[in-house]
Amino acid sequence: MFFAALLNCLRAASRYNGPMRDESIQFLERLVNTPSPSGHEAPGQRVWLDYVTPFADDTFSDAYGNTVAVLNKGGSPRLMLAAHADEISMVVNFINKQGFLYVRKMGGIDPAITKAQRVVIHTKNGPVKGVVGNVAPHLTKNDPDRKLPKMEDLFVDIGVDSRKQAERLVRVGDPITLSDQFDLLRGDLAVARAFDNRVGTFAVAEALRQLSEEKKKLQAEVMAVSNIMEEVGLLGARQIAYTLKPDVALVVDVTHATDYPTVNQQQHGDIKLGKGPSLTRGGCNHPEVVARLEALAESRKIKLQFEASSNNTGTDTDVIFWTRGGIPSALISLPNRYMHSPVEIVSLKDLAQIPQLMAAFARSLKKGEEFKVKI
């Protein structure tokens, strides 16, 4: 299984002709393809930890699996680079007499696009394949009451014909993920199931790697964090931000690309693939941190797009910024088409610029520097 996955990663790297190293593309593909449903992130965290360990001064994980890699330990200020490791998923909730599995959602999964998909149930004895059942259109075309599916109506078929057979394979509480994997599309565009938010954990790891190459120039302590359970309530970020007590934090997540038909840009903003990362202004984003990021991007010719936040961002930034006495924080986002679907599309060129920007921010920090709103 491991060698097959590694071979696929090498094939993808050989087909990619862009700004990232082959080793980085291979890491991204392994990270995306490793299932990490909310509350069950350990397999993906191991992939992340294996990658960052060679260039970190220290690594550790906490009781729930938030995983941290530290560079320049003891430096000041203390900078946290955070991204969540989990993906939207489902969980086995009930097994009926015929052996079909009924599910509950973990995170913002859409029942309408989940029907007729291949899935994997993650059990203590290994993965079990299944499909989300779907009634053929021939059998429903004369049904005047046909409606969009609800989560409680979805069922998973694992190829058995009784509850007893099903219970030999799966248990209530086993997590379920969709089985679509990483692939290159055209140019620098890639498609996958879980770019939300493996691109973030990839970016913070890459930023740490880049910083490790010029560690002597670094005055800040940098803590790269792959945190858990964002999709079900921003839970891991609360835990690890409280533990680490950073002086400043940069959060990486995806945002909605709005450059395709049917999306109202007047309502949702104008965000495109291939036009650079997005920086959020307002809300919990500290104005001085945002201004520093803008200036650094301009000096390094990194194109930025901008989004407005009047209150919450819906990301880990929302809980990090009010931890303890308030941590100066900013959100950097990667535009993502078709978010929370099996076919999320991102630009790898956009993605490559995020660790560059975070590394530049870390290098810009002077010993003991603080970010405060000027009164």
Language model feature labels by segment:
Residues F2-I375:
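N-terminal hydrophobic/helix-forming segments and targeting peptides
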